[in-house]
């Protein structure tokens, strides 16, 4: 099937999509208990309907696939058009996702509030975009000053894993 997941806090009762032994997703998301863990969106991890609940096999497969994709980003041949990151990632969607979140100064982007999906037979795809309540001059403060694009504090838009590695290409 197809899958949707997110970089965000886990809901009650969830354990998330965790990297397999020897793999990493990079330092995605927040620090603390939810760090380096992705949360399921569809199918759900916790659902009363067993047909809408993710299976252990699905979770293991997606974790392994994301781990392989991450490993290509740190390989010496990461930018090889056949065996590098483009084999796993929808690059155009990554670029669009990054531009939309960065141009709107979305303080939650990349570390929280980031949806991703993996269409059946498709590549890992950024989006759909969401959660702009802390963007474009909101009361957050970090989204008002353009000088905070690379100051840390959750607004270092060009160093988040997955994206930062692709920016080397």
PLM-predicted stretches and their roles:
Residues 1-169:
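Phosphate/dinucleotide-binding and metal-coordinating scaffold of catalytic cores
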């Amino acid at each position: 099937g197809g899958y949707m997941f997110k970089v965000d806090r886990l809901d009650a009762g969830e354990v998330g999509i965790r990297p397999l032994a020897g793999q990493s997703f990079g330092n995605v998301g927040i620090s603390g208990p939810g760090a380096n863990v992705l949360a399921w969106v569809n199918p759900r991890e916790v659902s009363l309907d067993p047909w809408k609940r993710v299976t252990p096999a699905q979770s293991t497969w997606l974790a392994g696939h994301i781990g392989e994709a991450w490993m290509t980003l740190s390989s010496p041949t990461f930018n090889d058009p056949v065996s590098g990151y483009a084999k796993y990632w929808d690059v155009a969607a990554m670029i669009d996702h990054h531009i939309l979140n960065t141009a709107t100064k979305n303080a939650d982007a990349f570390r929280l509030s980031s949806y991703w999906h993996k269409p059946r037979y498709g590549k890992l795809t950024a989006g759909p975009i969401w959660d702009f309540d802390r963007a474009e001059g909101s009361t957050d403060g970090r989204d008002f000053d353009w000088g905070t694009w690379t100051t840390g504090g959750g607004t270092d838009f060009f160093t988040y894993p997955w994206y930062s590695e692709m920016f080397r290409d």
